[in-house]
C-alpha cells in the first residue's frame, strides 16, 4: 500500500510540475491607443489635469455589453494606453467638465491615434494675475459655450503647487479652499458680466509656484474647467 501511495504521489507531482512548466500560450497586449482632447472653439488641447477626463473603451469584438476600461487624461490634454488588445472598440470621452459626447466605434490595432473634440461647460476668460508682496491676485471672467441646460455653477478655486502638475488633485490645500469664491447660482447675465478676483496670501518667499484657476458646475463629476498655468516667482 505504501508503495502504491508513493507511486501515485510521484505521478501527481510530475503531472503538476509538467503543467506548471508549460508556456502560457495566451498572447499579451499588442496594441496602443492615443490622441488629443481638443476644445471645440480654440482647437487647442482641452484644459484639464491628470485624470480630469476619462476615455472610456468598450471592446465590442466579443460582447455587445462589455465591461468598460478607462484611459485617464494627462495634464496636457492628451491620453495614451500602450497595453491594449487589438479589437473593435466603442470609445467615449467621459467623466469630465464638458457636455456629453457620442462615442465612436473604431478598430484599434498597432498604434491607433484618434482625437476628440469637447465643448467645456465653462471657459475662464480674460485671465490676469499680479503679485503684491507675497499675495497672488488672479482675476477672470466666465463664459458658457452652451447656456441652456447648464448645471448650477458651484465655485471658482485657486490651485497652487510647486510643480507644473497643478489642479484639484495636485495643489497645496492651504492656498486653495480658504481662498475659493462660492457662486452657487444658475448661469445669468450677471455672472457673465462679473469679474472675479481671487487672492492667495502668504506665499513663501524665495519659492517658485505654479498656479491656475478652476471653475466647476454641479454635475455628477464636479470636475473643473481650468485657466492656463502661470509661473509665480516670489521674491
Predicted regions and their residues:
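Extracellular fibronectin type III
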Residues: 220-235
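Short, ordered, surface-exposed loop/turn motifs in non-cytosolic proteins
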Residues: 42-64, 150-154
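Beta-strand-rich modules
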Residues: 200-222
Amino acid at each position: 500500500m505504501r508503495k502504491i501511495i508513493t507511486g501515485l504521489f510521484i505521478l501527481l507531482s510530475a503531472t503538476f510540475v509538467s503543467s506548471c512548466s508549460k508556456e502560457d500560450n495566451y498572447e499579451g497586449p499588442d496594441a496602443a491607443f492615443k490622441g488629443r482632447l481638443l476644445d471645440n472653439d480654440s482647437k487647442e488641447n482641452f484644459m484639464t489635469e491628470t485624470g480630469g477626463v476619462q476615455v472610456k473603451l468598450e471592446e465590442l469584438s466579443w460582447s455587445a455589453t462589455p465591461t468598460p476600461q478607462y484611459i485617464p487624461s494627462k495634464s496636457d490634454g492628451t491620453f495614451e494606453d500602450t497595453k491594449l488588445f487589438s479589437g473593435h472598440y466603442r470609445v467615449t470621452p467621459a467623466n469630465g467638465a464638458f457636455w456629453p459626447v457620442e462615442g465612436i466605434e473604431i478598430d484599434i490595432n498597432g498604434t491607433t491615434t484618434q482625437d476628440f473634440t469637447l465643448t467645456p461647460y465653462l471657459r475662464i476668460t480674460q485671465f490676469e494675475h499680479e503679485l503684491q508682496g507675497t499675495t497672488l491676485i488672479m482675476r477672470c471672467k466666465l463664459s458658457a459655450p452652451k447656456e441652456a441646460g447648464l448645471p448650477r455653477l458651484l465655485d471658482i478655486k485657486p490651485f497652487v503647487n510647486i510643480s507644473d502638475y497643478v489642479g484639484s488633485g495636485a495643489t497645496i490645500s492651504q492656498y486653495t479652499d480658504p481662498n475659493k469664491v462660492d457662486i452657487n447660482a444658475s448661469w445669468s447675465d450677471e455672472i457673465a458680466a462679473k469679474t472675479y478676483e481671487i487672492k492667495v496670501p502668504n506665499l513663501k518667499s524665495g519659492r517658485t509656484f505654479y498656479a491656475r484657476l478652476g471653475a466647476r458646475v454641479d454635475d455628477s463629476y464636479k470636475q473643473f474647467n481650468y485657466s492656463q498655468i502661470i509661473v509665480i516667482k516670489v521674491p
